[in-house]
C-alpha cells in the first residue's frame, strides 16, 4: 500500500529520469483447455535448480566455431562489418589471436559441479516431450516466417512446428490490425516481443510480471544485436525465408548466461550497473591510466572485475548505457576464448548504435579482472595491444590489481556492519533488566538477519545509473531463497513503476516470507527485505540509516563523474 515517504533524504540531488509513456497493453485470454493436456505445472519441478544456480561467472565453451558461417552469411547479405583480417590477425567472434600470448600462465581452475552447464542441455527434448512441457520458463527467438532461431530448451530444429504456431498467433493478431503483447492461460503467461522480422517469446509460470518478462526479452534482443547488429534485418528484406540460426551458432553459452542472470543480477531490471568497492585513490589511479590512451582511437575503456565496474572512461559526448555494459560483460564472461588469450572481436552496442559494429579488444589480467577497449577502427589491434601493455604496467606499479583482489574477497556490504542508531546508543537499559535478558534481546535481533530484522537491501542511484546491494545473510544463504527474494524485488519494482497505478513513492508489503519496503525519491531507489514480523516504523528508521550509510561510503562504492579520454 502507499504511505508517506520517510524523512531525511540523505542522497545527493540529481536529475530524475522521466520515462516515456507506455503504450496500451493488448491482452488475450485462453482457457486452460486450450493448452496441451500435458502442458502442466509441477510445483516440485524447478528447471533452474536442475541446471545449477549461477553463483559465479561461468567459463563455458568458445563461440569461435560459428566465425566462418557468421562472416560468410553476412557478406552474402551485404551487411558484413569491415573485416579486421587485413591487419594480419585472426579475430572473429572472440577467437584467439595468432600472435597473442595467454592472458595468464596459471592453469584455469575447473568450474564447480554447481556451475551451470557448458552447453545447452536437454537437446533430446521437443514439444512432444513431457519433460519439456514441465519447464517453468521457456524463451524462443524466431523469424517472421516461423523459422526457429533459438530456444532455451530442446533442439531448435525439432521445435520448427512449435515456432510456426507462435508465428501464426502473432500474424493472426497483426492481420486484424492489432499487436499482441501477452496471453494468459491458467498459470502460464506468454509474452511476445516483435522487433521487425525477429519475434521473441517467453512462456512462463513463474508469476513474474508482464513488464519484467518483456524487459528480459528486450535484453535477449539486445544480446542478439550485440553479436549481429540490427543490420541483419537486411537479410530478411532480401529473403523473407532467411535462416538466421547459423549466424548465432555457438552462442548458446552467451544466452544461457543471460537467462541465468535474470535470476540473480539486479542489473537486469534496474537498468543500472554496479561497481567494485575500492578506495577512492585506487579508483582514481585506474581512471587516470585509462584516460591516457588518446593516441589509440579508443571510444570507451572499461576495467571490470567479473560483472562489476572498476573504472569507465569514454570519449567526449559519448556515453555508455548500463544495459550495454551488462550485455558486453555477459558476452565476455560467458566466452572462454576471451579468458585464454587477448582477443579482438567485432561487437555492437545496441543502446549506443544498433546499426554499426565496434571492435572490442579484451584482455584478462587474472581470472576475474579484465580490460575492454572499444574502437571504431578495424585495424587498431596492435595499437590497443600496446595501450594495454602500458595500462597493465601502471596498474601493477600502483597495486591496483592487488587491491581489486582484496576488495573481491573482503569488501562486500554486510547488514551486520550497518552503523548503530546514534539515538539508541545514548539510552541505557533500565536497571531492572538483567544482563542475561539484555543479551537475549540483542541476540534475537541479530538472529533474524540484522538490525530491526533487516535481511537485505538494494540501493540505486538514479543520477549515476549505479546500484549497490548487500550480501545475503545466513538466513537467506540457500540459492532457492535468494532467487525467491530476487523475484519479489522484481515484482516490487514493477509495482512501483506501474504507469497505470503509479508511479509510487513508497510501498510496504508483508507476506509469509518477508516484509518488503521500497522508497523512491528523485535521487535514489531503495528496496529492502525484512523479517516478516518486522515493525513498519522500525523498518523506516533502518532504511534511513541504510541511506546515510550509503552516503558515507559513496566515494568507495560508486564511480563519480565518468572520466573522458584525453583527446
UniProtKB/Swiss-Prot annotation:
This is Vacuolar fusion protein MON1 homolog. Signal peptide: none annotated. Keywords: Endosome, Guanine-nucleotide releasing factor. It comes from Oryza sativa subsp. japonica (Rice). Pfam families: Fuz_longin_1, Fuz_longin_2, Fuz_longin_3. One of its GO terms (biological process) is late endosome to vacuole transport. Belongs to the MON1/SAND family. GO terms for molecular function: guanyl-nucleotide exchange factor activity. Interacts with CCZ1A, CCZ1B and RABF2B. Residues 43-52 have a biased composition (Acidic residues). The lineage of its organism: Eukaryota, Viridiplantae, Streptophyta, Embryophyta, Tracheophyta. One of its GO terms (cellular component) is endosome.
Amino acid at each position: 500500500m502507499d504511505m508517506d515517504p520517510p524523512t531525511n533524504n540523505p542522497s545527493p540531488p540529481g536529475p530524475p529520469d522521466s520515462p516515456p509513456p507506455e503504450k496500451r497493453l493488448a491482452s488475450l485470454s485462453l482457457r486452460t483447455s486450450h493448452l496441451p493436456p500435458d502442458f502442466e505445472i509441477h510445483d516440485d519441478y524447478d528447471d533452474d535448480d536442475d541446471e545449477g544456480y549461477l553463483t559465479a561467472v561461468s567459463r563455458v565453451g568458445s563461440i569461435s566455431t560459428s566465425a566462418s558461417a557468421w562472416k560468410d552469411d553476412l557478406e552474402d547479405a551485404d551487411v558484413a562489418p569491415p573485416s579486421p583480417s587485413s591487419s594480419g590477425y585472426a579475430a572473429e567472434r572472440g577467437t584467439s589471436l595468432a600472435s597473442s600470448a595467454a592472458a595468464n600462465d596459471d592453469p584455469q581452475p575447473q568450474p564447480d559441479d554447481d556451475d551451470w552447464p557448458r552447453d545447452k542441455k536437454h537437446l533430446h527434448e521437443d514439444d512432444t516431450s513431457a519433460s519439456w512441457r514441465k519447464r517453468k520458463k521457456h524463451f524462443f527467438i524466431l523469424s517472421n516466417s516461423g523459422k526457429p532461431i533459438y530456444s532455451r530448451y530442446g533442439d531448435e530444429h525439432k521445435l520448427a512446428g512449435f515456432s510456426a504456431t507462435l508465428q501464426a498467433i502473432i500474424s493472426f493478431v497483426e492481420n486484424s490490425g492489432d499487436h499482441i503483447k501477452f496471453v494468459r492461460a491458467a498459470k502460464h503467461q506468454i509474452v511476445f516481443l516483435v522487433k521487425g522480422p525477429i519475434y521473441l517469446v517467453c512462456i512462463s509460470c513463474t508469476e513474474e510480471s508482464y513488464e519484467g518478462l518483456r524487459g528480459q526479452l528486450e535484453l535477449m534482443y539486445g544480446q542478439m544485436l550485440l553479436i549481429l547488429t540490427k543490420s541483419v534485418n537486411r537479410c530478411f528484406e532480401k529473403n523473407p525465408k532467411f535462416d538466421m540460426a547459423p549466424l548465432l551458432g555457438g552462442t548458446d553459452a552467451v544466452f544461457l548466461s543471460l537467462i541465468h542472470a535474470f535470476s540473480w543480477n539486479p542489473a537486469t531490471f534496474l537498468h543500472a550497473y554496479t561497481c567494485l568497492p575500492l578506495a577512492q585513490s585506487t579508483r582514481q589511479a585506474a581512471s587516470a591510466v585509462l584516460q591516457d590512451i588518446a593516441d589509440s582511437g579508443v571510444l570507451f575503456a572499461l576495467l571490470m572485475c567479473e560483472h562489476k565496474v572498476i573504472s569507465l572512461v569514454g570519449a567526449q559526448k559519448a556515453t555508455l548505457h548500463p544495459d550495454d555494459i551488462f550485455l558486453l560483460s555477459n558476452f565476455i564472461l560467458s566466452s572462454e576464448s576471451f579468458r585464454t588469450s587477448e582477443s579482438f572481436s567485432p561487437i555492437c552496442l545496441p543502446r549506443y548504435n544498433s546499426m554499426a559494429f565496434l571492435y572490442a579488444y579484451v584482455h584478462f589480467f587474472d581470472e576475474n579482472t579484465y580490460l575492454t577497449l572499444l574502437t571504431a577502427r578495424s585495424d587498431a589491434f596492435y595499437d590497443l595491444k600496446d595501450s594495454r601493455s602500458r595500462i597493465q604496467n601502471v596498474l601493477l606499479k600502483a597495486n591496483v590489481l592487488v587491491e581489486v583482489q582484496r576488495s573481491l574477497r573482503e569488501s562486500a556490504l554486510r547488514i551486520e556492519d550497518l552503523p548503530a542508531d546514534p539515538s539508541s546508543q545514548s539510552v541505557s537499559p533500565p536497571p531492572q533488566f538483567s544482563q542475561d535478558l539484555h543479551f537475549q534481546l540483542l541476540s534475537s535481533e541479530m538472529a533474524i538477519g540484522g538490525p530491526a530484522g533487516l535481511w537485505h537491501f538494494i540501493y540505486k542511484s538514479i543520477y549515476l545509473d549505479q546500484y549497490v546491494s548487500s550480501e545475503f545473510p545466513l538466513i537467506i544463504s540457500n540459492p532457492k531463497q535468494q532467487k525467491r527474494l530476487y523475484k519479489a524485488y522484481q515484482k516490487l519494482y514493477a509495482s512501483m513503476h506501474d504507469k497505470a497505478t503509479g508511479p509510487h513513492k513508497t510501498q510496504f508489503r508483508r507476506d509469509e516470507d518477508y516484509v518488503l519496503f521500497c522508497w523512491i525519491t528523485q535521487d535514489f531507489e531503495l528496496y529492502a527485505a525484512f523479517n516478516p514480523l518486522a515493525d513498519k516504523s522500525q523498518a523506516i528508521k533502518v532504511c534511513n540509516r541504510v541511506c546515510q550509510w550509503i552516503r558515507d561510503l559513496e566515494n568507495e562504492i560508486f564511480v563519480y563523474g565518468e572520466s573522458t579520454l584525453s583527446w
